Curated annotation (Swiss-Prot):
Stated name of the protein: Large ribosomal subunit protein uL3
Annotated source species: Mycolicibacterium vanbaalenii (strain DSM 7251 / JCM 13017 / BCRC 16820 / KCTC 9966 / NRRL B-24157 / PYR-1)
Subunit: Part of the 50S ribosomal subunit. Forms a cluster with proteins L14 and L19.
Keywords linked to the UniProt accession: Ribonucleoprotein, Ribosomal protein, RNA-binding, rRNA-binding
Gene Ontology cellular-component annotations: cytosolic large ribosomal subunit
Amino acid sequence: MARKGILGTKLGMTQVFDENNKVVPVTVVKAGPNVVTRIRTPERDGYSAVQLAYGEISPRKVNKPVTGQYAAAGVNPRRHLAELRLDDEAAAAEYEVGQELTAEIFADGAYVDVTGTSKGKGFAGTMKRHGFRGQGASHGAQAVHRRPGSIGGCATPGRVFKGTRMSGRMGSDRVTTQNLKVHKVDAENGVLLIKGAIPGRNGGLVVVRSAIKRGEKA
């Protein structure tokens, strides 16, 4: 079955009860409505993909090139525009320009991958950023308790290797959490209740796609 996807907004976390009266932590995602603005095919573009637009925005805030893209599709401008790759041309044939996608593309119990931008933490040390254990708390350790330690020899190699884990800015990265279960689809309100936590802040843009590793499960 072809992978499905939709753009949405993370609203926050809450908890609900399942059929066994057990508490289930869920993230509430406002999913869609999305509108299809373009369909890419192997013959014309070299690959299969669908372009989705989501979110309200004043037309005066959209520049002319982007406005032209929306005009060609015959839809009003949206705040977010994203392209989702498809498996093949047959999957692309399931979409048409101007089509509207809502939360109903997913079913209760489906497994999804959720992509978002993680919260920014600012400049962080190695213990917080990479999980270093730090230096000893006693036995002669003085004012080095949270330092990373050696990052390389003076003469050999005489440089710091690329990729060495050091202090730096943490967060604000594109993160995907895989194999999350859709606990409930609220079609009336266009909301997905996804079991567990997803990346990003409340109000942030997320992409919800069918799980690539285990597929859908009704």
